Amino acid sequence: MPFLSDNRTLAAGAVVANVLDGKFNRVLQENSKVTVAQVCDGDVASTIIIGRELLMDDQLTLIESVAGGSPRNPEDIIAQSVGRAGEEVIVKVRNTDAANAQTVKTNVYIEPL
């Protein structure tokens, strides 16, 4: 089961088009169930797309329950769907805070069907 993760600090007002950019398994190798878990330490909005399916559109991400904690499965799942071989998984993040940097942590679980 492929696993992708990302941990980054976003500058105030920053946008990252796809936190999975450059990771091999962001493009599905076969039909798969895709699960995205994410936490942040402040005001971060996320957009999640699998292929042509928009699962989450610029919605606030869960605040981490444990300071410095990583996303937990199943507690911090924010989206889950099935994608087809060749489709790309996109997780866009945006710091909605105009004054402070925010940390966002993302885990993506890919389970072939």
Q: Which role fits each region the language model picked out?
A:
Residues 1-113:
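Beta-strand-centric surfaces of beta-sandwich/beta-rich domains
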